[in-house]
Structure formats: C-alpha cells, structure tokens
Amino acid sequence: MPSFDVVSELDKHEVTNAIDNAIKELDRRYDLRGKGSFEQKDLTVQLTAEAEFQLEQMLEILKLSLVKRKIDIQCLEVKDAYASGKTMKQEAVLREGIDKELAKKIVAHIKDAKLKVQAAIQGEQVRVTGKKRDDLQEAIALLRGHEFGMPLQFNNFRD
C-alpha cells in the first residue's frame, strides 16, 4: 500500500551556515559593527545588542540569511527582548518536528477533504497511506496549498 510521511525538519548544517553569514553581515554593517552579536546553541540563537532597534535590525539580517540558505522562516519563533545590564538580549528558536496539535490539524485537514487516504500520527511525523499513488499526490497538493504555520516536507514516498 503506497504511503508517505509528512515531517518538519531543518538542515542543521545550513542553519549554522546561515548564522555564520549573519555574523559576517553584522561585521560589514557600519551602523552595527561591534555593537551586537549572534550566539548559536543547538537550534537557539541569542541576539545581543546595545539597543532594541539594533536587535530589530539584527533579526532582519538573521531572517534574510536564513531565506538565502532556503530555510523557511516560519519555523523561527522570536521571543520578547529583555534588558540584561546595559545590553538588550533576544532569543530566536528554530522549531523542528511536528507537535501533537499540528499533527491533529494535518490529520483533520486531510479527513475534511474526504480524500481516499488515511492519516496516522507517529511521534513527530504523520504517515499518510492510500490505495493509489494519485490519491497520495492529491494529499500532498492539498497540504502544500494550506498554511499550517510550519514548513512541511514530504519524504519516504513508497509504492
């Protein structure tokens, strides 16, 4: 029986490259040179600057470098800025994986479309099975056309 998996994954190497590019861009910008920094810890990026408007500029630099590396910025969750002594700090978390709520939304969306496929939640992914390959391709087109707030990838397509 043909099937595929719906996942939300990030290429960690590309994320690291994007953050490195953002650091280089920060050094090139005259208005931000020496006034801010990016620190990466796994999938969390901490932005540090002297003022809040500089944090906003740095966040734009980070978003642009992620887009250049073909990383969807929907997975970027930006937290509120806070003061730490004389500096301002802000965290940006790159989300990965499909949580239970999003998985339920995906399954409900597939069921509401009344396609001839079944969707099942398996941890951080959703497995979609059907009798025909065409039904699965319809399900992929349906999911691509809907906005879930997270980038979705489709892998493990089996006949």
Swiss-Prot record:
GO molecular function, one term: nucleotide binding
Keyword Nucleotide-binding: yes
A Pfam cross-reference name: DUF520
Keywords: Nucleotide-binding
Keyword Phosphoprotein set for record: no
Alphabetized SUPFAM superfamilies for the sequence: YajQ-like (SSF89963)
InterPro entries: DUF520, UPF0234-like_C, UPF0234_N, YajQ-like_sf
UniProt GO cellular component terms: cytosol
CDD domains: YajQ_like (cd11740)
HAMAP family noted in UniProt: YajQ
Function of the protein: Nucleotide-binding protein.
NCBIfam families named in the record: PRK05412.1
Similarity comment: family membership: Belongs to the YajQ family.
Name used for this protein in its record: Nucleotide-binding protein PST_3153
Naturally occurring in which organism (per UniProt): Stutzerimonas stutzeri (strain A1501) (Pseudomonas stutzeri)
